[in-house]
Structure formats: structure tokens, C-alpha cells
A protein has these predicted regions:
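Short catalytic micro-motifs in class I SAM-dependent methyltransferases
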Residues: 52-56
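Residues at the starts of beta-strands that form the adenosine-phosphate
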Residues: 4, 18, 140
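Adenosine-cofactor binding site in Rossmann-like domains, unifying the SAM/SAH pocket
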Residues: 12-42, 145-146, 151, 155-164
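Conserved class I S-adenosyl-L-methionine
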Residues: 4-11
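S-adenosyl-L-methionine-dependent methyltransferase catalytic module, highlighting the catalytic core
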Residues: 59-172
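Local beta-strand N-terminus motif with an aromatic residue
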Residues: 2, 45-46
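Anionic group-transfer/hydrolysis microenvironments
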Residues: 9, 25, 84
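A conserved beta-strand element that flanks and buttresses the S-adenosyl-L-methionine
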Residues: 49
Length: 172
């Protein structure tokens, strides 16, 4: 039985066969450009994955997105999110472990999209994201380990180590 797995905001990362890639960028593996209006029937999607995507939207927009995505999921379907963790960044900064410059990318997320520069509009910690997910209809909210996924070999920022990708000496 084929699973419908969607990678939202994938950019250049192509997870390969068995994944649908949706992103506003212009890449060969992209099937749709609109993550705000998924072209799937309600209750038809097994997994929606969005790594470092929702922080580019206002919180009010995100609640609408999350509610829409929830309706697309099958019963027992999974929404897997990765966001910059504000509590970790602030703790590491306050501890003096890293300078502010170390966090400017994860905090503000400057990215070029077509002809525009876009930036993060909000930040999350676990509690704020959990409240938002529950308000959007998600019942089971938990953290997940990037090492235990079938996309663990991709640097998609779910492995957001500081310093970047220093898995030996860095911290999440």
C-alpha cells in the first residue's frame, strides 16, 4: 500500500521516490508551489513534513495552515514539524556559549524567494508550538528525533546544530 508523504517547503532537497515535494521555489522535483492550499482530499495524507517552514508565517496564518493540514491527514496520520527552538537559542546565548551572530540565521531566516527576500515572522518554543497545534485540532503532540526518520540523511535544518551540522561538538 503506497503512503502519501508530503515534504512542504522542501527547497532543493529531493527526498526521492515516495515523497511529494511542495515548495515555492523553481526546482525540477516540485509538484506544486502552494503549501497553503494542498491539492489533496481530506483524510488522504499519511505524513506531512515541514522543516523550518511555519516560522515564515504570522501565527494567525499558521493556525489556519495547521488546521487545513490536519484535515488532509488520514486518521492516525502524522504532521512532523521542525522549527528553530527559541528556548534553546536563548539558553545558549544567555550561557555565553555562543554569540548573537550564531543565531541570526535561525532566528530571522533570511531567504530569497523568487525576487523577494523573506524573513521569519515569529519564533516558537515547545510550549507555544504545542498550544498552537492543540488549538488547530492535533491531539497527540510530542517531540521527535531526526535520527529515527527515513529522511535523516538530509540537512534540512531539523538537524539544526550550532555550529551548523557539527554533530560531534555542537548542540541542538
Amino acid at each position: 500500500l503506497l503512503m502519501l508523504r508530503i515534504n512542504l517547503g522542501c527547497g532543493w532537497r529531493d527526498f526521492g521516490e515516495g515523497w511529494v515535494h511542495i515548495d515555492g521555489g523553481d526546482y525540477d522535483h516540485i509538484e506544486s508551489k502552494n503549501i497553503c492550499d494542498l491539492p489533496y482530499e481530506d483524510g488522504s495524507v499519511d505524513l506531512i513534513y515541514a522543516s523550518h517552514v511555519i516560522e515564515y508565517f504570522d501565527r494567525e496564518e499558521v493556525q489556519t495552515l495547521l488546521t487545513d493540514w490536519q484535515s488532509k491527514l488520514k486518521k492516525g496520520g502524522i504532521l512532523r514539524l521542525a522549527v528553530p527552538d527559541f528556548s534553546s537559542m536563548s539558553r545558549l546565548y544567555q550561557d555565553g556559549a555562543f554569540s548573537l551572530d550564531s543565531f541570526l540565521g535561525p532566528l530571522y531566516g533570511k531567504m530569497k524567494m523568487q525576487e523577494n527576500l523573506i524573513y521569519h515572522k515569529t519564533a516558537y518554543d515547545y510550549d507555544s508550538l504545542e498550544r498552537l497545534l492543540r488549538a488547530s485540532g492535533y491531539n497527540e503532540v510530542m517531540t521527535w528525533d531526526w535520527r529515527k526518520t527515513d529522511h535523516s540523511h538530509f540537512d534540512d535544518h531539523s538537524q539544526a546544530y550550532v555550529p551548523h551540522m557539527d554533530k560531534e561538538n555542537g548542540t541542538l
